[in-house]
């Protein structure tokens, strides 16, 4: 039996949403602690432990998001999200490169700037990887005649009629409201 959406519309929905967000933040916190432990104090084993805790927290957050039906379970919507995510990842490369330039101007050391530039390359890789998944597994669809909307915050691309989505629709990538999208 699927856990997807079991708490959506129930008295637990708000609590589960808070747990999902808290676990996601907790995952990022443990990853940051791992970097600090390794880079500042040379504690490689402590860093490994924190990375494992971060992985667990991230997994917990995903579970709670599933309980609330946060991401699409319909196959068409699933692949639409993957396509939009892929395009956002490609756009992320340029955005993160620009961030690296600004950080360099602010005086971030070369090692830090290089790390951010590596993140930009990883964003590009994420775009390439999701594109390869789409090409290999997704049903073929013609999107040429469908309207496209792009989230102004994260670059997620929605294909189809956004007006058909409920008023409380949120970007599946950054959780911004429907009003954050611009028609292309």
Where are the model-predicted features located?
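Non-heme di-metal
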Residues: 1-184
